[in-house]
Amino acid sequence: MSKTLNIIWQYLRAFVLIYACLYAGIFIASLLPVTIPGSIIGMLILFVLLALQILPAKWVNPGCYVLIRYMALLFVPIGVGVMQYFDLLRAQFGPVVVSCAISTLVVFLVVSWSSQLVHGERKVVGQKGSEE
């Protein structure tokens, strides 16, 4: 019985912490003058708490495993909601594809540029002919 209560406590604690960060993000988003989704702010709060080791990762792991395991199921309502606008999407298929392609290219270029900026040019160990 004690082991069962311990497992229930771990899952309950994980979900309470994840939802606390989510609702803190929603609250902060309601105070901001710009529109930023509260879920994004909540994820950033959770990330900062984990990165600064204020919140031990083992406290949120059980809840994260459950959410990741059933993530595909959580996208079903979104897919059904998008299908309500199928005619609009079909009419605007060209611009949607072009904007997706352009935004993918822009993201690729920005990530490659920022990676080059952060990491710089590095000498490959064992590379011949690069000793100057």
Curated annotation (Swiss-Prot):
It comes from the Bacteria. Pfam families: LrgA (PF03788). NCBIfam families: PRK01821.1. The chain crosses the membrane at residues 7-27, 31-51, 63-83, 93-113. It comes from Escherichia coli O157:H7. Its main location: membrane. This is UPF0299 membrane protein YohJ. One of its GO terms (cellular component) is plasma membrane. Keywords: Cell inner membrane, Cell membrane, Membrane, Transmembrane, Transmembrane helix. Residues 28-30, 84-92 are cytoplasmic. InterPro entries: LrgA/CidA (IPR005538), Uncharacterised_UPF0299 (IPR022957). Belongs to the UPF0299 family. The gene is yohJ. Residues 1-6, 52-62, 114-132 are periplasmic. It is a multi-pass membrane protein. It is found in: Cell inner membrane.
